[in-house]
Amino acid sequence: MKILVGNDDGIFAPGVRALANTLAPDHEVTVVCPDRERSATGHGLTIHQPIRAEQVQSMFVDQVTAWACSGTPADCIKLALGALLDSPPDFVLSGINQGPNLGTDVLYSGTVSAAMEGVIEGITSIAFSYSSFTDQQFQPAANFGQQLLEHLIQHPLSEPMLLNVNVPAVPADQIQGVALTRQGIRRYHDLFEKRIDPRGKTYYWLAGEVMEDLEDDRMADPFVLTDVQAIRQRCIAITPLQYNLTANNSLNPLLAWLTPLQKRQSVI
């Protein structure tokens, strides 16, 4: 199979190296990643300056073709699909990210956005994240990525979609299983640290603490874990995501809410 791999941690990150090298013996793997750290850039694109891409060597096994791109994670996948590859890949993978992408993290995540770019182009995609910001034992996550990819090949999905995969930061023999999950709630208590540079000008660092599982019990589905809950239980979490953000459950209530305004507008 032809596999395109991106990330947001950059071309030098050990997570993408583990994933690409693990897949390379059985697949045609092309890596296109940012040339530097691009975490939390969301689905941003570069439109006001050129994008540059250079092939890199020595960081991956010989079977892997790798490019370092000056753009965002989404730029990397878009550029690969539109210019660098001679034909579309069978799958787009992203990661393995250093740190989890749970709940509302996916709205900010360059890792998830890179994979979502594949889905926008009609290609089944997977985003992989390892739930530690410090531990770099990526091989169990890479091994699971290989297993999941083989399962997708043998049992194709009915339509292209994004699978957001979070792997708990525990030894492989302590992983408690694989759970199909829904997106949880993972917000942050933001804190901006105010500092003064040597020239007397003010600047800020974004910091803060994670607030997890703030879901209203009345809205909870007791039969499907959230991704946050699954990781707490040492399970691999697989969450299907889509780019259509329409709040479908709100459409009918909003029709009644909007009717008075529509009537008023009709007489203007």
Swiss-Prot record:
The EC class name is hydrolase
Is the keyword Manganese assigned to this protein? no
Q: Does the keyword rRNA-binding apply?
A: no
This protein is called 5'-nucleotidase SurE
Give the required cofactors. Answer: a divalent metal cation
Task: Quote the HAMAP family the UniProt record gives.
Answer: SurE
Q: Which function does this protein serve?
A: Nucleotidase that shows phosphatase activity on nucleoside 5'-monophosphates.
Q: Gene Ontology terms, cellular component aspect?
A: cytoplasm
- MF term (GO), any: 3'-nucleotidase activity
UniProt organism field? Acaryochloris marina (strain MBIC 11017)
